């Protein structure tokens, strides 16, 4: 049959734009995004028959509402309405309710370390040593239940601070966990990288391909039949006796150091231990970064 051609008007532009993770669009990134938003809004706007402009509605989610008015004005040039509004009981906002902490819902525990009169680097080394050695002790006693606390995630405000800690981990921390003090009560920690600590990094100075591999390896769990002190000593004895010790293709990370890149896109259920170095710049960083550990609160509470 013959086709019928009829003139049609322009398709109606989008009426709704949803922006997730608004709190991350700050600084240089916010400046660049603000320029693109002008073009997006122009292409998404239209006029009624009487010439009245109609712009799309923008709904944005953010981890903090602090300075939200200034941020929205800078990005979109608009006024902002915040919801849910302030309520009388912060534990019940109608949209969300606070879950009480009990054995079934242990939540996350935040512990602050006040190291007055001690250099920050010394405090980092000492705390990292204790956390890594304690993880090995837990693995020897509890087996697979200790896996979430065998990988130490370090969070830093700047790459410069992270680079310094990366050097300390492979030097000072490595030496301390390999030779714990006799009165410490901690066993020796053999790293998963041929006896050395296996260290990963999530920063902008790492190639994209390596970041993908690091994220994949974050899901590798410690095996009580391979990583406990008894299992390690058994492999060493086999090697000395001329036997071929057991091996594995990929090894889990002992330490992962990260900057703000950790806040988004990292959803690894097994992680349960984080060391936050210094004071994060805002509340959103506390929420986003620390929520990367303890994502399975019923079985792996975060510390």
Regions found by a protein language model. Name each.
Residues 1-12, 258-260:
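Conserved RecA-like ASCE ATPase "motif II neighborhood" in helicase/translocase motors
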Residues 13-16, 53-59, 251-255:
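Loop/turn-to-beta-strand initiation segments
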Residues 21-29, 262, 279, 293:
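Conserved Walker B
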Residues 21-29, 40-75, 85-86:
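Conserved helicase ATPase motor motifs in RecA-like P-loop NTPase domains
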Residues 56, 65-176, 200:
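Conserved interdomain linker/interface between the two RecA-like ATPase lobes of SF2 helicase motors
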Residues 75, 90-121, 188-256, 267:
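Conserved motor-coupling elements within RecA-like helicase/translocase cores
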Residues 262, 266-279, 301-303:
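A short beta-strand element within the Helicase C-terminal
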Residues 292-303:
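Conserved segment of the helicase C-terminal RecA-like domain
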